Structures are given as structure tokens and as C-alpha cells.
């Protein structure tokens, strides 16, 4: 079942250590098949060096039950599941503890849009969620992690299709895209703009956000209705 999707998810997971986005077994990638109502996700705690496509776990979006697979799915599976339910435009999700994005998350800081590298992928400030409550942490923690992400986007009026990433306060980044590969691509860029942002803040603590006109130009030329960037 879903052998092609399993291979795609495996390859996307293997890309995480190659791009220095994970340490040890941290991090996970999933991808969804909406017609079948399932998603494929990395198994929990399996080393990237020995992981195979057969290790990938198929999970129901509706129930959260394992549909296929012999291993336990990632502990972050409920977060992925809720995001697939809440954001129907996304096809793949990545969670990492990449160093510089996690620094922003641990500081409880959103990443402002100060340059065109950021604007090419993220249409504005990359948000950081609020702190989770004790009840949320002690309850269905991973599910509530998804809820706090969705709450942040709803309260701030952010379109998940235009903002393919978020920082969870005191935790780390989640990124998404049209498929697993695209989600990893966005996670790589998220880490890079987080890295740049730290130095920008050191050099110019009062640096304002970039011009809205320039933000619009760079985002919309790649992603807008009249996009013209690329082949």
C-alpha cells in the first residue's frame, strides 16, 4: 500500500541529516494521500542510517489509527494529523530541531521578514506560537501542539499556503509544503533565514521589517497569480 509515497517520505526524512537539520533521531517528515484519507510518517526513534521504506507507518487522518506498518509512528504524529485536518492545502510536513530556528522558538520570538531570501518563501513574519498551558502539556500534548499552531494562524489571519512554517514556543519549527520534498525545502530555508535573522538582529537591533512592496514583489513573482519566476 502506498509504496511510492513511502519511498518519497523515506527520501525526505533522509534529506534532514544531509542538510544538517537534525541530530541523532530528532525530526520527522510525513506526506498525505487525501484520496485515501491517510498519511505516511517516519517511525519513532529509528536511526536514519538504517531506516527503509518498509519502516514507514501509514496512519488514518480521521482516527489516528495505524493502518499499515510494524513500527510505532513518530511521537509527533498527532501534530501532523491535526495540521492535515486544519490546512487542506498542504501535502507534506516536517518537524525538526534545527539549531537556529529552535533558538528563535526557545526565545519565543517570531522571525521578521527583513530580506528577499525570506520573502521568496514566507509571505511575512514567521510566527511563533504562545506558550502552551500546563493543561495542554499534561493532556494530549502532541495534539495540543497542533492546536496551538492552528490557533496562531487563525488569530493572526495567516494563510498556511503563504506561510509554510511556524515556530512552536520553547520547542522548535514545523514546516510544510505541497509534498514531502517541498516541505523539506521549506524547512531548509526556514533554518537559513533563522540563521540570517540572528546576525541581522545583532548588527542592527532596531532593524525594521523589509518594505512591503519588496516583500510583495519577491513572494508574488514566485507564488502569485501572475508568477513568472522559474521555468
From Swiss-Prot:
UniProt activity-regulation remark: Inhibited by glycolohydroxamate at concentration above 0.1 mM.
Which pathway or pathways does this protein act in? Carbohydrate degradation; L-arabinose degradation via L-ribulose; D-xylulose 5-phosphate from L-arabinose (bacterial route): step 3/3
Return the EC number. 5.1.3.4
Please tell me, according to the UniProt entry, what happens when changing residue 218 to N. Answer: Mutant shows a strong decrease of the catalytic efficiency, but it retains considerable epimerase activity. The affinity for L-ribulose 5-phosphate (LRu5P) is relatively unaffected
Cofactor, how bound (note): Binds 1 zinc ion per subunit. Also able to use cobalt and manganese ions, but less efficiently.
Q: How does activity depend on pH?
A: Optimum pH is 7.
Q: Its domain of life?
A: Bacteria
- Can the keyword Metal-binding be found in this entry's annotation? yes
Q: What is the effect of changing residue 142 to Q?
A: Mutant shows a strong decrease of the catalytic efficiency, but it retains considerable epimerase activity. The affinity for L-ribulose 5-phosphate (LRu5P) is relatively unaffected
Residues reported in the UniProt entry to bind substrate: 27-28, 44-45, 74-75
The UniProt record describes its induction as: Induced by arabinose. Transcription is dependent on the transcription factor AraC, the cAMP receptor protein (CRP) and cAMP. Also induced by L-lyxose.
GO annotations of cellular component type: cytosol; protein-containing complex
Question: Keywords in UniProt for this one?
Answer: Arabinose catabolism, Carbohydrate metabolism, Cobalt, Isomerase, Manganese, Metal-binding, Zinc
Top enzyme category:
isomerase
Q: Write down the CDD domains for this protein, in alphabetical order.
A: Aldolase_II
Tell me, according to the record, the phenotype of the null mutant. Answer: Cells lacking this gene accumulate large amount of L-ribulose 5-phosphate when incubated with L-arabinose.
The function of this protein is: Involved in the degradation of L-arabinose. Catalyzes the interconversion of L-ribulose 5-phosphate (LRu5P) and D-xylulose 5-phosphate (D-Xu5P) via a retroaldol/aldol mechanism (carbon-carbon bond cleavage analogous to a class II aldolase reaction).
**Can you name this protein?**
L-ribulose-5-phosphate 4-epimerase AraD
The encoding gene:
araD
